[in-house]
Amino acid sequence: LIEYQLLDEATGATVTGLPAGIGFNVLNGIVTVSGTPIVNITTQTVYNYTITTTGSPCSGSTTGTITVDPDDAIALISAVGTDAQVLCETDPLAAIVYQFSEGATSATVSGLPAGVTSVIVGNDLTISGTPSAGITTTQVYPYTVTTVGTCSSAILNGTITVEPEGGLDLTSAAGTDAQILCENIPIAN
């Protein structure tokens, strides 16, 4: 809310240079500028406005600025499907790369499995690594990438599904897995 008091013989005012969604009204000698900017911008934009008084033989004016920052943006820039991978527990993850832009100055990620990390270089957040071994059932890791900036955060979600490696347990007697045999002699129980 921006307010100005009309002085002397001024009875009204006009305001120019406001961004879309911002308006003004004059009531009881007060000029009020208010609203929500509805603009499609990708970088910070400065709107210089001018308020000019009316109703007096000599009009006065003043200026001000409204600076509008864009909302955050984020996009998956690695191959389609990299944000929904299924892999074995000791296989490396294909890199998942997100690019943040507009109002975003950084990004964070949560929900990654052990062994998988993220790093930021420039405006790119890369998720990579090899899930740690030791699971016995399929594990689904939903993760969230959230931008950091001055305005509304952008959020994207993905999943990493980790399958356990097939395992074997020796069920015959101990030592039967390392036998020394002679020709024509069967494997011992």
Where are these regions (language model features)?
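Short, solvent-exposed loop/linker segments at the N-terminal edge
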Residues: 84-92, 178-186
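C-terminal edge beta-strand
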Residues: 58-70, 151-163
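A short beta-strand segment in extracellular, disulfide-stabilized domains
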Residues: 1-5, 91-99, 186-189
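Low-complexity "stalk/linker" and mucin-like segments enriched in Ser/Thr/Pro/Ala/Gly
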Residues: 12-31, 107-125, 169-170, 180
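A short beta-strand micro-motif common to beta-rich folds, especially ectodomain repeats
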Residues: 43-55, 137-149
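Extracellular/luminal low-complexity segments enriched in Ser/Thr/Pro
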Residues: 31-43, 126-137
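Proline-enriched interdomain boundary motifs that mark the N-terminal boundary
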Residues: 71-81, 165-175
